[in-house]
């Protein structure tokens, strides 16, 4: 039995039409699910009894099971969820000045093998289904509505999505696209495409395919190194798609979409954080419609990497080369909020 959360509005319309129901019923169902937060088909009273019976017999509306909910002093909330096959995934709520941002997971584990990342310690087991990605947002939305029941400032709903959790989103390409479709649909969450950011470590063919769609969603490149020598050491994907190929894909994306791109750069002590590295990075991305998001490293005991003590100098070196850059705020340092960290600790892989 399929979860109804996996379907876009168009897909649900087609299913209903094939079964002799009206296409407009899909809009009614979406309104119940996403506007009224009702998942019980029997309570969808403007649907015919026959349709409610059909839905109950052919679809489920199961959400994720919360295993852990950790709330940080800075307001960050990290959830560990159990899936139907007893695997676990993480989702993070990050309150921002501009709204409520949620970081979602797209895979159980990750095969990209980035040596500094807690996610990569657990290899990819499977892709998440669309409903499993959607359910993360749905669950956090419910959490916010319960936390701020009478709020009128927007704090009680998810407004921004970053697809930067466990896994490589473009390695789960079709499901990620359907997820974005549902997020963006005014009949569902109604989250504007420019409030959605998809991150990739550099799957060049998928970056180009994503560019061809000309979506208004944001693209972030997990770069983390200014040259092939360093990137080969910490990101195995670079051996398949070295920086010259990655930068060609970036240029293609910018040309096709006319959208600014983000380069994410985790600063790791004595690995990629020297002033010389900053100058190399500036030369690599000079002239591109882009900015750099400098990220303090969140340490994992099981690997030798440590947080850089040279962040300020690196930032100033980029600025001196006229590179747009920011240092990202650290979220949830007191609650194991690094990507994959909570899950790995619970499963006994990290200490």
Label every model-predicted segment.
Residues 72, 105-106, 119, 199, ...:
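Short linear Ser/Thr-Pro motifs
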Residues 93-94, 175:
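Residue-level structural signal for beta-strand termini and adjacent loop
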């Amino acid at each position: 039995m399929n979860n109804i959360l996996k379907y876009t509005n168009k897909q649900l319309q087609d299913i209903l039409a094939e079964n002799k129901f009206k296409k407009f019923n899909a809009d009614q169902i979406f309104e119940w699910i996403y506007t009224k937060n009702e998942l019980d088909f029997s309570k969808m009273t403007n649907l015919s009894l026959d349709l409610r019976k059909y839905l109950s017999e052919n679809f489920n509306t199961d959400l994720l099971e919360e295993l852990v909910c950790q709330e940080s002093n800075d307001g960050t909330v990290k959830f560990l969820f159990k899936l139907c096959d007893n695997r676990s995934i993480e989702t993070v709520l990050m309150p921002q000045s501009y709204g409520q941002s949620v970081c979602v997971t797209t895979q159980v584990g990750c095969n990209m093998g980035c040596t500094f990342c807690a996610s990569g310690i657990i290899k990819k087991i499977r892709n998440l289904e669309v409903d499993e990605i959607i359910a993360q947002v749905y669950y956090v939305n419910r959490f916010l509505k319960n936390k701020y029941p009478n709020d009128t400032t927007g704090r009680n709903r998810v407004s921004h999505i970053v697809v930067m959790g466990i896994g490589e989103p473009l390695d789960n390409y079709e499901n990620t696209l359907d997820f974005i479709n549902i997020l963006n649909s005014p009949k569902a969450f109604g989250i504007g495409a420019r409030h959605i950011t998809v991150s990739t470590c550099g799957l060049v063919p998928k970056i180009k395919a994503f560019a061809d769609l000309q979506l208004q969603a944001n693209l972030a490149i997990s770069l983390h190194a200014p040259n092939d020598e360093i990137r080969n050491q910490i990101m195995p994907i670079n051996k398949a798609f070295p920086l010259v190929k990655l930068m060609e894909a970036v240029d293609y994306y910018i040309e096709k979409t006319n959208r600014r791109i983000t380069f994410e750069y985790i600063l790791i002590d004595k690995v990629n954080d020297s002033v010389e590295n900053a100058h190399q990075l500036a030369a690599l991305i000079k002239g591109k419609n882009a900015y750099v998001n400098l990220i303090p490293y969140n340490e994992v005991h099981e690997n030798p990497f440590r947080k850089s003590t040279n962040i300020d100098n690196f930032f100033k070196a980029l600025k001196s080369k006229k590179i747009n850059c920011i240092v990202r705020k650290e979220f949830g340092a007191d609650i194991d909020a690094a990507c994959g960290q909570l899950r790995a600790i619970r499963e006994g892989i990290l200490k």
